[in-house]
Amino acid sequence: MKSIIFIIVFTIHLGLLAQNEYSCAEMHLKGKVKSIAETTQYAYPPQKLATMKMQSPIPTLYSFNQRGDLTEKIIGADIKYVYQYDRYQHYLSGGKKYVYSEKIKADIMFIRVKDGAFWEELTFYKKMTEKLRIDYLSPVHCKISHTIGGKVIDEKEIYYQKPYSYSKIDYILRDGKKEVYTYNDQGEVTTIIFYDENGEVTNSYGYEYVYDAQGNWVEKKQTFQTPIPDKYPEIVRREITYYD
């Protein structure tokens, strides 16, 4: 009997979404993708399962226009992001609305220079403002800052193998610690190795993928070299539809 049993659960992330969200190309999708239904399950040990209530999977649905832009992201029955875009010169700008139970909870504006300078996203809530800013210091180096209500939540530096590309991260520095990424031929991360301030390995994550005929992954399995308290490996599955 397997020592680990899988149960499907869903985690909602309401914070700012990463800069690789706005198009098929930035999400490494191949072909003319129309929509993605994505669910996540976790590998819980039996002792954890014994104290948990079973939950049904809640998919995250992504919709794209024929140009490849993300137009909607729907999480379960209550959460929806609606995207609008403007393109001019070397910029991509626009906005999206965070809708919860059919009520607009936040307006979000973003602007990005395609090949340099900065990328920024501002989320306006009723009581606070959330800001994510990326400053490109060179074609292979940038700094990222994340603030909520003027308070710094996270700061890190990223070094790339390719100029201005989020598909080939070399390593991330945060608070003196280092994360090193390696990739497969499809551009998906296969390992993340974590180092402490002294350069010693503290843990590593591994990822395995199953691909469809178009070359897009439809299953991603995560493993941990060392177990992490209250954190469990993920299995993410996708159902992808394409434009004719």
Segments (PLM) and residue ranges:
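Bacterial Sec-dependent N-terminal signal peptides
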Residues: M1-E21
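Buried hydrophobic residues that stabilize the cores of well-folded domains
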Residues: Q19-D244
